[in-house]
């Protein structure tokens, strides 16, 4: 009985020994999903997740700067507070928690650059991508506004958690740091959500949010000295809107152009090089 | 029916029918078939990109930390200004975790010539693949550090370029010993994480493999940063030495190849011959339950 060949599989042209199937490209406009509650639930989840992300992280930044302010906390304040390492942990750890919580609901993007990368890879529809980005941006603004609402004096005094290119670094350096940082993040997201890897891991994706959180943490360690680390346009937008300072606004373009370019490069690298989905390579037999 | 199957498979496959894993056969030194597969070149590209990202993130973290703790640049109270040496150790360990996770299914996630060398000694990769990986890792490291220098060249030169060299107060023997033991810890963890017997015991779900490898790197950095800045990865040391290009890193550079390769060899021997009882199998004088 077991020896019988599954003719339908052979006729479909699929490789029979593979126990995973790459999902078909998402349509640009999916009329069906517009009528489903799951789309709106996902959008709400992205909004709330991004709101929480910005509230926790910006509150951490403001608290750190207050505790290390010599004029507010005494002359030996420099070593108080959670430190830059603690800020990096806040960003990375919060992404881990929130991706874990929302992965099954919205895919756990929490970042317009991630949504853009997945859209380029045809894993989300255009409508869904736009709704997610809008929800993320609004959530970010609300999250930072909560921080300002609760500690407005400190918020304005300590830079509002806004992303700006630091003194001593050029605009080009900031842009490059954002591009590479977002590449690391989106590349990790692609690896974590790859159906082939899920099949190899016996379809147990339990660890997927952890490397994504660690990727955010790592990029923050490397990039905080340069730009305060954006790699998330919603995060940068939220702080710029609520802080509303000319320096933050004049550098804002870096935090959209850089992440979107980095996400696009990551999408190309993963889809074309690693998954070899461009079947134009006639000279190699692909085992993707 | 059930008993016949057991007896038959037992007779045909030798003893211990209860094992639900098989050790893969030793990789051939030269595998002509794999040279024609895209998967080999994809793996080499993945190793290059992974090592490039590893060096970019980690060296940028080192330079950023030194800049933020530089009193002449960031004020008199700068000593606690950066991510700290702990943050640097996290950057190395965390980045290895992320990158091993991303490339494990593509290239095995080595990102380190010492790991490749250890796995080659254990016959888990072919000679050609090992050499290609090592070249890709070294080139990726050079490009990664090159990116850091391109983006912040003044700070890169001023703050030592993230290069590995022996710290003052430590002898070369101490540095070499630290690199040997540090790499032993890392490669031994890699062997344990990729052991087919352990995968069988864990129901063939290798999801956690990259995490202890990343933590091993993190732990070794905590211990060895004061001694040598921690190499335990010849590509990492080479990348920084090439781009920074000063006498001191080059004088000490041999430590960062001899130490890691010796440590990897010891780890390969320990895991394959003692823990997996490869020698006992060969001798046949003990009944092995490997």
From Swiss-Prot, chain A:
It comes from the Eukaryota. The keyword Nucleotide-binding does not apply. It is found in: Cell membrane. A motif (NPA 2) lies at residues 232-234. Its main location: membrane. InterPro entries: Aquaporin-like, Aquaporin_transptr, MIP, MIP_CS. A motif (NPA 1) lies at residues 111-113. It holds the Pfam family MIP. It is a multi-pass membrane protein. Disulfide bonds: none annotated. The chain crosses the membrane at residues 42-62, 81-101, 130-150, 172-192, 206-226, 254-274. Keywords: Cell membrane, Membrane, Repeat, Transmembrane, Transmembrane helix, Transport. GO terms for cellular component: membrane; plasma membrane. PANTHER family: AQUAPORIN OR AQUAGLYCEROPORIN RELATED. Aquaporins facilitate the transport of water and small neutral solutes across cell membranes. Aquaporins contain two tandem repeats each containing three membrane-spanning domains and a pore-forming loop with the signature motif Asn-Pro-Ala (NPA). Belongs to the MIP/aquaporin (TC 1.A.8) family. PIP (TC 1.A.8.11) subfamily. This is Aquaporin PIP2-6. It comes from Zea mays (Maize). The gene is PIP2-6.
Curated annotation (Swiss-Prot), chain B:
Pfam families: MIP. The keyword Transmembrane helix applies. A motif (NPA 2) lies at residues 233-235. Induction: Expressed in roots with a circadian rhythm showing an increase at the end of the night period, a peak during the first part of the light period and then a decrease. GO terms for molecular function: water channel activity. A motif (NPA 1) lies at residues 112-114. SUPFAM superfamilies: Aquaporin-like (SSF81338). Expressed in roots. One of its GO terms (biological process) is protein homotetramerization. GO terms for cellular component: membrane; plasma membrane; protein-containing complex. Keywords: Cell membrane, Membrane, Repeat, Transmembrane, Transmembrane helix, Transport. It is found in: Cell membrane. The chain crosses the membrane at residues 43-63, 80-100, 131-151, 173-193, 205-225, 255-275. The keyword Zinc does not apply. It is a multi-pass membrane protein. PROSITE patterns: MIP. Belongs to the MIP/aquaporin (TC 1.A.8) family. PIP (TC 1.A.8.11) subfamily. Homomers. Can interact with PIP1-2 to form heteromers. Aquaporins contain two tandem repeats each containing three membrane-spanning domains and a pore-forming loop with the signature motif Asn-Pro-Ala (NPA). This is Aquaporin PIP2-1. It comes from Zea mays.
């Amino acid at each position: 009985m077991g020896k019988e060949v599954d003719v339908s599989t052979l006729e479909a042209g699929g490789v029979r020994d593979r126990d995973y199937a790459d999902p078909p490209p998402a349509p640009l406009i999916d009329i069906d999903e517009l009528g489903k509650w799951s789309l709106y639930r996902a959008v709400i989840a992205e909004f709330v997740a991004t709101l929480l992300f910005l509230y926790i992280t910006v509150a951490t930044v403001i608290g750190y700067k207050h505790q290390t302010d010599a004029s507010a906390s005494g002359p030996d304040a420099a070593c108080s507070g959670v430190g830059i390492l603690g800020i990096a942990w806040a960003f990375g750890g919060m992404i881990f928690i929130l991706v874990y919580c929302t992965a099954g609901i919205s895919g756990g993007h929490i970042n317009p650059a991630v949504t853009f990368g997945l859209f380029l890879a045809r894993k989300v529809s255009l409508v869904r991508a736009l709704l997610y980005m809008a929800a993320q941006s609004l959530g970010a603004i609300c999250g930072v506004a909560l921080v300002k609402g609760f500690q407005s004096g400190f918020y304005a005094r300590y830079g509002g958690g806004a992303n700006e290119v630091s003194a001593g670094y050029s605009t080009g350096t900031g842009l490059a740091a954002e591009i590479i940082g977002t590449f690391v993040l989106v590349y990790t997201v692609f690896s974590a959500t790859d159906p082939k890897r899920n099949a190899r891991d016996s379809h147990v994706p339990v660890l997927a949010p952890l490397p994504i959180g660690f990727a955010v943490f790592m990029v923050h360690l490397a990039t905080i000295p340069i730009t305060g680390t954006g790699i998330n346009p919603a995060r940068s937008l939220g702080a710029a809107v609520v802080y509303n300072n000319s320096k933050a606004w004049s550098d804002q373009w870096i935090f959209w152009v850089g992440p979107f370019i980095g996400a696009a490069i990551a999408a190309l690298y993963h889809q074309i090089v690693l998954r070899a989905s461009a079947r134009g390579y006639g000279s190699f037999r692909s085992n993707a």
